[in-house]
Each structure stands twice: as structure tokens, then as C-alpha cells.
């Protein structure tokens, strides 16, 4: 991938950009095999990759500069701003949105937040695009609601320029820290969720729900999990850390009982909406802590699917799964180090199958799917 920002030394986020994709995949595979070296693995599946540029469905832009000349991008460690509107990881459809947002920031009087001075209002611009219909969700992260009336007044102009903006919100983040969003979300549009579709499964994206940033690879990840589950004798499964339900909705069949657990209520609202659309009546989604839910249950499903954040599932849940002993565990991980640590805490299981998904090209990060079978 060619990147003018990297070549000029202005951005170093894609640390592996000079390596061809096959070399990147080899290095990631070697890293994963090294982390799992202590465990016999029955089957290593070929790694899955997608496009090397224009693949991201989300932009998280720090707003800096002045209200007349805002910059959208990031701050270097020394506080120097960098405009990243030309980042080649973004699809071409993002360019006209960034181009319209800059004059809009001036029109609405949204003074960029100055970290050093602790002054200003507009901290971040968060943009998400649906692959299914090109609809977009735009979030303005503000320090307070001081400029809310001005923003509302100026909004019709922006909507006229960008009819693809289906969901527009303001998020209030009052804390002087590098935290992306606060708890308060104010909707400026009637529509509150963005419609997405992977492998004919309807998915919904709401402002405060996690969604994968590489749709091409994420859809293959979900399809692979579905294929693995269909090969197993499963009538009852749990989907823990389920997010908007991507895994569970792909894996479920009409006669399967499935419970999806996620701590974020916004994500659970999305999952329930999808299940209703699919007419799957035996799916239950609940906004709870996954570890607390699991340890409070009496019955044991045949399969537990876990998709934890980077910290992994942790010893308490590993201990409980070991005691409960479901026949199968599918572990989807964005941090193979913590996954390997968790597998060490599950001595009653063997690794049947592992597959690497290159969700984050040009970086050392990757996603991995692992099938564990009770010994």
C-alpha cells in the first residue's frame, strides 16, 4: 500500500506498511504458532485476509486546529496535530464527508478542543459507514452541550450536502483525558441505528456499541464460526461478550437455543432487533456481565462461544468453564497473548482448530478463531 503520509514521516500508525501482505501474514502466523507452541494443535487453517487499503468502515478523528481551519486526524505525542483525511485505509466515500465537515465546523462555531489549554468544545468526529447501503453514522464528541443549539441550527446544511448521513448524534465527554466518548448520547436524527448486513444476516450499529472495523474480514470471521458450529452436534449454545450479536446470529438455527450476553445495553438492543428480523424466537440477548452470568447458571450448553476484549476472559471465567465443562468452546480473540494465557487455564480442553484473520493489515495485530474440544 502506498501512503503519502507515511512516506513524508507524518504518520507511523501502519508500522508494517513497507512489508508485502504475504510477509505480514507469515510474521503473524509465526507469532501465533509461537504463542501456542506448548499446545498440540490438530489443524492449522490457512489465514484469511482482505483488501490492503480502503477497508475501514470507521474513522476516529481528533479535531484540532482552529474553528476556521479545523484539522481532522490525530495528535502526535508532543501535541502536534496531523490531518489524516487522506489516509488510504479509509474508503473513497469518506473524502466528501471530511470535505463537507470542515466548513460545517466553522458554520456551527464548533471550536476544536485544545488539549494544552483545556479550552474549546469539539473533541472528536466519529464516522461509520454501512457496507450494505452506504448509509453513515456521524458522531460529534463535545466537551459540553454549550454549542448544541448552534449545531442543531446549522445541521440542515450538512444533511443537504451529505444525504448519506442516516444517524447523527452528539456525545458529551466532559473529562480532560484521552477518552473517546462519554456516557451521554444525544440523537439529532430520528433514525438511531445504522443497518448493516453480513452474509445475509441483518446487523445494527448503534453509537455506543462495538462493531468490527474491517467488514470484509469480519464477515469471513462470522461465516467461519457459523461453518464450524454447523459441523458440531449443537442444540444449545452461549455467546458471551456477544456485542451486537454477530457470532450468535450467524451460528443460530431455528431449533437451537442460544443466549447472548454483553454488558453494553446499546449492543444488546441491536442484537434483539436482528433476532426479531430473522424470526429466531429461541434466541435471548441480555445486557449482563458475561462472567457473572455464566457462573450463575445451572444448566450447561454444548457450546460456549467467547469473544472477549483484549484482556481475555480471565481466570474466574476459565475456572468456571473448566468446572461446567461444555463439550466445545469457540474462542474468538483480538489478542492471541491473552487467549494463550486463558487456554493454559483450561487444561481439560485440546485445540482442534485454529485460524488467523488479518483484520488489521500493516500492523502486528490480528484476530484468531480457535475451536477447543473437551478431552
From Swiss-Prot:
Pfam families: tRNA_U5-meth_tr. [4Fe-4S] cluster binds at residues 3, 11, 14, 87. GO terms for biological process: rRNA base methylation. SUPFAM superfamilies: S-adenosyl-L-methionine-dependent methyltransferases. The active site is at 334 (nucleophile). The keyword Transit peptide does not apply. It comes from the Bacteria. S-adenosyl-L-methionine binds at residues 212, 241, 262, 307. It catalyses: uridine(747) in 23S rRNA + S-adenosyl-L-methionine = 5-methyluridine(747) in 23S rRNA + S-adenosyl-L-homocysteine + H(+). The keyword rRNA processing applies. PROSITE patterns: SAM_MT_RNA_M5U, TRMA_1, TRMA_2. One of its GO terms (molecular function) is rRNA (uridine-C5-)-methyltransferase activity. Its EC number is 2.1.1.189. It is an enzyme of class 2 (transferase). Keywords: 4Fe-4S, Iron, Iron-sulfur, Metal-binding, Methyltransferase, rRNA processing, S-adenosyl-L-methionine, Transferase. Belongs to the class I-like SAM-binding methyltransferase superfamily. RNA M5U methyltransferase family. RlmC subfamily. Catalyzes the formation of 5-methyl-uridine at position 747 (m5U747) in 23S rRNA. HAMAP family: 23SrRNA_methyltr_RlmC (MF_01012). This is 23S rRNA (uracil(747)-C(5))-methyltransferase RlmC.
